[in-house]
């Protein structure tokens, strides 16, 4: 077995519950400090560790810590029940109670509110003093407090990172269970016919996997659901789990001020399901785009706004930007922003191929002389966003910070489908200005980089004008993961 680092809990990569905590794991967590042998005051009982009463007593600090750690790791915390029982246990005998905050907690306001309803409460909070001396939180910034993603060669973000780190090329011939390529493939297009000159894409391993029962959806309805919506529901739920949020009553965010912004580019399943399954009572909510974000809100019992978006390859960027604007305007307090692409119908391949944007030879050859178009790809991802000051106050796990976001359109391009370097240059400058950053502060740029001759040239030209020249010793690396995982269209600018 590989030796475990001293500062890493065994098998635990974040706060989580498990029904199986071994004695060896508990020994590791509790440790071997001599303080564990110290005796507690006789008769001391700690309410809330072993259940709803305080009938269990502990003789030493070690016994108490082991019991507390076991419950923390293996039992779900029902805070509403715990606080209600605590309040009842205090009864009318305690007119005044003192509360000591041992660390940052998003539940402090709820606990204090319940206790203050029936008695006087004094709060000892050293954190307020220490935090007031720290750095001020940057106004206008958005925190990413949770995220998820899966795509070609990856079932989660760790596997996704491994695809990038190991330089994998995920393109393959279109699987037979997606579509019959031979029915539409040709070496040269004919006028009026739906044909395609490409045979490749980058695909998820299990596009049909979906636990319908977990989401309270019948098998009949699940079959009619757009796979894009199924995967977004799973991705968003996973992102919320990583952020520590659920549909429970102890949230630090008002469910009426939680929004969903979801982007998709095509309606492949509408064609597939209508042809194979006809119309059903569940067809409407199965394929109508509005039900993509709506299902998540319904699942989580949120009553904030939901938005179904389509701005082609900029879909996920639009979702994130609009979510940021809603947060900064304080229209909402938390937002889920994401997008999904699942390739399941040949017709979207045919008209993209006829438009001349798809590679006939394989994956995206970003910034290469032999670039001949992009390779389509599956992907599903979601971000959980909050105002930075709220994320700090709620002790959220801040994964990254969005200093600024912006969107525009290439209205002066040579055609509606081509890029405009001038528009991109203007947008880059706007983002830097709003973020109060100098171009030399930027240390890496993830490019759009689809592998088209016109698009790649325009993008690199805009980046060069804004971020060059650079001082000696401060180079600017650029990259594009589309060379690994293809172009996932609506999702592409968030992965």
Model segments located where?
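Acyl-group transfer acyltransferase/transacylase scaffold of fatty acid/polyketide systems
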Residues: 1-156, 446-453, 486-487
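Condensing-enzyme catalytic core of the thiolase-fold
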Residues: 135-495
């Amino acid at each position: 077995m590989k030796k475990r680092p001293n500062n890493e809990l065994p098998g635990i990569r974040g706060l989580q519950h498990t029904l199986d905590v071994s004695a060896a794991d508990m020994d590791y967590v509790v440790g071997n400090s001599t303080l564990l042998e110290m005796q507690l005051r006789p008769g001391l009982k700690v309410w809330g560790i072993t259940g709803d009463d305080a009938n269990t007593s502990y003789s030493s600090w070690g016994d108490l810590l082991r019991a507390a750690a076991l419950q923390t790791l293996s039992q779900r915390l029902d805070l509403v029940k715990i606080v209600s029982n605590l309040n009842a246990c205090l009864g009318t005998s305690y007119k005044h109670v003192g509360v000591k905050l041992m660390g940052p907690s998003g539940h402090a306001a709820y606990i204090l509110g319940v206790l203050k309803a029936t008695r006087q409460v004094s709060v000892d909070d050293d954190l307020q003093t220490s935090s007031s001396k720290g750095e001020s939180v940057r106004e206008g910034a958005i925190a990413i407090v949770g995220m998820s993603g899966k795509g070609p060669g990856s079932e989660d973000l760790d596997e996704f990172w491994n695809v990038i780190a190991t330089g994998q090329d995920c393109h393959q011939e279109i699987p037979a269970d997606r579509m019959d390529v031979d029915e539409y493939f040709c070496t040269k297009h004919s006028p009026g016919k739906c044909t395609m000159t490409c045979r490749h894409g980058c695909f998820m391993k299990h596009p049909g996997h979906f636990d319908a029962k977990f989401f309270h959806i019948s098998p009949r309805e699940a079959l009619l659901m757009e796979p894009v919506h199924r995967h977004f529901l799973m991705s968003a739920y996973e992102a919320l789990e990583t952020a520590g949020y659920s549909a429970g009553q102890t949230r630090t965010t008002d469910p009426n001020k939680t929004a969903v912004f979801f982007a998709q580019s095509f309606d492949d399943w509408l064609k597939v399901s209508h042809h194979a399954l006809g119309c059903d009572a569940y067809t409407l909510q199965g394929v109508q785009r509005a039900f993509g974000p709506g299902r998540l809100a319904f699942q989580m019992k949120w009553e904030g706004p939901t938005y179904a978006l389509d701005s082609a390859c900029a879909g996920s960027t639009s979702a994130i930007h609009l979510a940021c604007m809603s947060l900064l305007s304080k229209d909402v307090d938390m937002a889920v922003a994401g997008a999904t692409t699942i390739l399941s119908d040949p017709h979207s391949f045919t008209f993209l191929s006829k438009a001349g944007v798809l590679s006939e030879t394989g994956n995206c050859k970003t910034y290469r002389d032999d670039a001949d178009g992009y390779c389509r790809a599956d992907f599903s991802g979601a971000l959980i966003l909050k105002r930075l000051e709220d994320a700090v106050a709620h002790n959220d796990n801040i994964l990254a910070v969005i200093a600024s976001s912006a969107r525009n359109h290439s209205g002066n391009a040579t055609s509606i489908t081509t890029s405009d370097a001038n528009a991109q240059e203007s947008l880059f400058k706007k983002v830097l200005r709003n973020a109060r950053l100098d171009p030399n502060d930027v240390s890496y740029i993830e490019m759009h980089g689809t592998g088209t001759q016109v698009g790649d040239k325009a993008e690199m030209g805009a980046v060069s004008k804004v971020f060059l020249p650079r001082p000696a010793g401060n180079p600017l690396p650029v990259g594009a993961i589309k060379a690994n995982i293809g172009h996932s269209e609506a999702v592409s600018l968030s992965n």
